[in-house]
C-alpha cells in the first residue's frame, strides 16, 4: 500500500489544534522535527484519499509518495526506558533486555513520543508478575506488548481505529506474545476486570474513559493515564476524583503529563 506524505510547518500555538484530529477520527499523522530542528506535522493519506476539510487551510511545504516500509527504515533501534528496547529493524538480539519488535504502519506510537516513554516507565515500575492489563487506545500495541513481556498474565488491547487494530495485531504476532487485540470504542466492548488500565490518549478522552473505568477495575487496581497536555491535567484529576481515584505519582516531559492513580 502506498501513501502520500504531506508536511506542514507547525507553530507551538498550533499543536493543540492537532488534538482535534483525533476528534475528527483522523489518526495518520506525526509531529516531528525537520533537519533544521523545526517542528513539522506529517500527514499520511492513502493514494486517492482526499485531504480532510480541516486541513485545507494549512500550508503544505513538502509532498511525496511513501510506504509504511519507508518509515520503518528511518527508525533505528532505541532504548525507550532502561532495559526495554524498541526495534523496528529486528537488528537487536539480546537476552539481557526486553526487545519489542515493531512494524509501525500508520498508527500513532513508535515509542519516540514522551507519552509512550512515560507509560512504559510506569508499567515497568508498577506491573507485578501475573497482573492483568488493559491497554485502551493501543495504537501500534507497544504498551500492551511491553506489559506482556514484563510478566502480565493477561493483556487486552483495544482501539477505536480499525487500522490501529490491524497494526497492533501484526506487532503482537511479530513479538510472539499472547495479547488479545480487538476493536472497542473506549470500554464499550471490554468485559472483566483488570489490575492495571493503561491509556495513552487525549485528556478529553480520558475524561470519558473515567466515567466507565470503575466497571473494569477493582479496589486495588491502578490507572496509568498518559497523553495529557499539562494545562488540561487538572481537568483529568477532577474527573478522576469524582469517580474515586487519586494521583499516586506524576511524571512530565515537556508539556506532556502522565498520571498514575489508585482508588481513594
UniProtKB/Swiss-Prot annotation:
CDD domains: AdoMet_MTases (cd02440). It is found in: Cytoplasm. GO terms for cellular component: cytoplasm. Its EC number is 2.1.1.-. Keywords: Cytoplasm, Methyltransferase, S-adenosyl-L-methionine, Transferase. InterPro entries: Ribosomal_L11_MeTrfase_PrmA, Ribosomal_PrmA_MeTrfase, SAM-dependent_MTases_sf. One of its GO terms (biological process) is methylation. GO terms for molecular function: protein-lysine N-methyltransferase activity. Pfam families: PrmA. It is an enzyme of class 2 (transferase). It comes from the Bacteria. Belongs to the methyltransferase superfamily. PrmA family. Methylates ribosomal protein L11. This is Ribosomal protein L11 methyltransferase.
Amino acid at each position: 500500500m502506498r501513501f502520500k506524505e504531506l508536511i506542514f510547518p507547525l507553530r507551538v500555538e498550533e499543536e493543540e489544534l492537532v488534538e482535534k484530529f483525533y476528534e475528527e477520527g483522523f489518526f495518520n499523522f506525526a509531529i516531528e522535527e525537520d533537519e533544521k530542528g523545526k517542528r513539522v506535522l506529517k500527514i499520511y493519506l492513502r493514494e486517492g484519499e482526499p485531504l480532510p476539510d480541516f486541513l485545507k487551510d494549512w500550508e503544505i511545504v513538502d509532498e511525496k509518495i511513501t510506504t509504511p516500509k519507508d518509515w520503518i527504515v528511518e527508525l533505528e533501534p532505541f532504548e525507550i526506558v532502561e532495559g526495554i528496547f524498541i526495534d523496528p529493524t529486528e537488528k537487536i538480539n539480546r537476552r539481557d533486555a526486553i526487545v519489542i519488535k515493531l512494524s509501525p504502519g500508520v498508527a500513532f506510537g513508535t515509542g519516540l513520543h514522551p507519552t509512550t516513554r512515560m507509560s512504559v516507565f510506569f508499567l515497568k515500575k508498577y506491573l507485578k508478575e501475573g497482573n492483568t492489563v488493559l491497554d485502551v487506545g493501543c495504537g501500534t500495541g507497544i504498551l500492551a506488548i511491553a506489559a506482556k513481556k514484563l510478566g502480565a498474565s493477561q493483556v487486552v488491547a483495544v482501539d477505536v481505529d480499525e487500522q490501529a487494530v490491524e497494526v497492533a495485531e501484526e506487532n503482537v504476532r511479530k513479538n510472539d506474545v499472547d495479547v488479545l487485540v480487538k476493536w472497542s470504542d473506549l470500554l464499550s466492548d471490554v468485559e472483566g476486570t483488570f489490575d492495571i488500565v493503561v491509556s495513552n490518549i487525549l485528556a478529553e478522552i480520558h475524561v470519558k474513559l473515567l466515567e466507565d473505568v470503575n466497571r473494569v477495575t477493582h479496589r486495588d487496581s491502578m490507572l496509568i493515564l498518559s497523553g495529557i497536555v499539562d494545562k488540561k491535567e487538572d481537568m483529568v484529576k477532577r474527573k478522576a476524583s469524582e469517580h474515586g481515584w487519586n494521583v499516586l505519582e506524576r511524571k512530565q516531559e515537556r508539556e506532556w503529563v502522565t498520571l498514575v492513580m489508585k482508588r481513594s
